[in-house]
Regions:
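Extended ligand-binding regions for polar small-molecule ligands
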Residues: 56-65, 136-139, 146, 151-152, ...
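Acidic, polar ligand-binding/catalytic clefts
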Residues: 73-146
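Extracytoplasmic small-molecule ligand-binding "clamshell" domains
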Residues: 24-101
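Periplasmic-binding protein-like
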Residues: 41-42, 126-131, 210-252, 269-274
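A ligand-binding cleft/hinge motif common to bilobed small-molecule-binding domains
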Residues: 83, 102-115, 164-167, 192-229
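N-terminal export signals
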Residues: 5-21
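Beta->alpha turn/N-cap motifs
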Residues: 39-44, 73-77, 92-110, 159, ...
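Bilobed "Venus flytrap"/periplasmic-binding protein-like clamshell domains
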Residues: 37, 51-64, 129-182
Length: 274
């Protein structure tokens, strides 16, 4: 009996710190730990590649605004954003890592928020678009995708731009699409090297490679199904981390107002827009 009581007391003592930690608010946990754990997508140029990029700069700046350190949690995207939110924001991965305090680069979309009630999406910091870059000497004007017929065009096949081009005009462009590129940055480099006359991808990808080169024009992809206004990207935290969400929102507004946010994008050759 006495042994069972001792074991019960020991178990209670061990559990007490964990229980107290769980009782802390999201912001209080960050401050107690002394660092903001930030989830970052692997291999997402120009936002994150091997510990560098716009999202890495932004993660550090947000942590500095909260007066804590930063701990980066890079991860590979799963099959859906909902999976990423589950693994990185509100539950953690089944392999034992996560969750983070905040996930970067989350689409700020009502449908996504409604479908994921355990998370809070906030602090939009950039507006992304699907775009196409072209060599001006080869394609002075690009009013429609019909001008690309019979011309080599680089695009990542497993991307929104790739999906739009592969299905455009009943598949009329398929024969000359080069889709083996891993992302829009690689496609843009192929264009810069003269391998193709145009490259499609996200505006940020193309601008980071070609934005300063007057030989090329970068414009919205003239495809009827392309989101004309693009989409905002922001951050996500657990739904009940209200004080952390408010602190991050204030921090983002401060970075925007001071010009620091725009400077982060400019350092990567990407014009900041929201």
């Amino acid at each position: 009996m006495k042994r069972r009581l001792c074991l019960a007391a020991l178990a209670a003592a061990v559990a007490a710190p964990a229980s107290r930690a769980e009782a802390l608010s999201g912001l209080a946990r960050v401050r107690q730990r002394g660092s903001l754990v930030v989830g970052l997508y692997h291999d997402m140029p120009p936002f994150h590649v091997k510990g560098e990029g716009i999202d890495v700069q932004l993660a550090r700046a947000l942590a500095a605004q909260l007066e804590v350190g930063v701990s980066l949690l890079p991860f590979h995207a799963d099959e859906s954003v909902a999976d990423d939110l589950r693994h990185v924001v509100w539950r953690g991965h089944y392999l034992g890592w996560g969750p983070a305090d905040v996930l970067m680069h989350v689409p700020v979309e009502r449908a996504l928020m409604d479908a994921n009630p355990r998370v809070r999406v906030l602090a939009p910091y950039y507006r992304e678009k699907v775009a196409i870059a072209r060599r001006l000497d080869a394609l002075p004007v690009l009013d429609s995708l019909a001008a690309l017929r019979g011309r080599p065009v680089a695009v990542a096949g497993q991307s929104l731009a790739g999906w739009l081009l592969i299905g455009a005009d009943g598949g009329a462009l398929r024969d000359t699409l080069l889709t083996h590129w891993p992302d829009g940055v690689a496609a843009a480099r192929a264009l810069r090297q003269g391998e193709v006359v145009a490259a499609a991808g996200l505006a940020s990808e193309l601008e980071s490679v070609l934005g300063a080169d007057a030989r090329f024009a970068i414009e919205p992809l003239p495809a009827p199904r392309a989101p004309s206004e693009g989409w905002a990207i922001g951050c996500a935290v657990k739904k009940d981390a209200v004080d952390l969400a408010e602190a991050l929102q204030r921090a983002m507004q401060s970075l925007q107002g001071s010009g620091q946010l725009a400077a982060m994008f400019q350092s990567a050759g990407v014009p900041w827009r929201l």
